[in-house]
């Protein structure tokens, strides 16, 4: 698991969302959310939207800051 995957899964779980909930919010499939949390990086527009949704920086999601 990558740092991005770990942080995305952590944020989703601590906010109480299922993968399906997040997929609906982001306008993507549940499979996309699963992939982000396991082996695939989100595309830049999705990364930015995820950061805004969770109110964290993209640097945090990328593992550049704590």
Spans of model-derived segments:
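DNA major-groove recognition helix of helix-turn-helix/homeodomain DNA-binding modules
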Residues: 45-60
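Short basic helix-loop element that most often maps to the first helix and adjoining turn
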Residues: 6-25, 49
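Short, charged recognition helix plus adjacent turn
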Residues: 14, 31, 62-66
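Recognition helix of helix-turn-helix/homeodomain-like DNA-binding domains
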Residues: 27-42
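Conserved hydrophobic/aromatic packing and binding residues within compact polymer-binding modules
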Residues: 8, 22-23, 33-36, 61
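A detector for short, charged/polar N-terminal pre-domain segments
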Residues: 1-3
């Amino acid at each position: 698991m990558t740092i991005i995957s770990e942080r995305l899964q952590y944020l989703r779980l601590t906010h109480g969302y299922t993968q399906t909930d997040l997929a609906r919010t982001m306008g993507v499939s549940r499979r996309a959310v699963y992939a982000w949390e396991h082996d695939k990086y989100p595309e830049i527009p999705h990364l930015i939207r995820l950061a805004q949704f969770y109110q964290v920086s993209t640097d945090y999601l990328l593992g550049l800051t704590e």
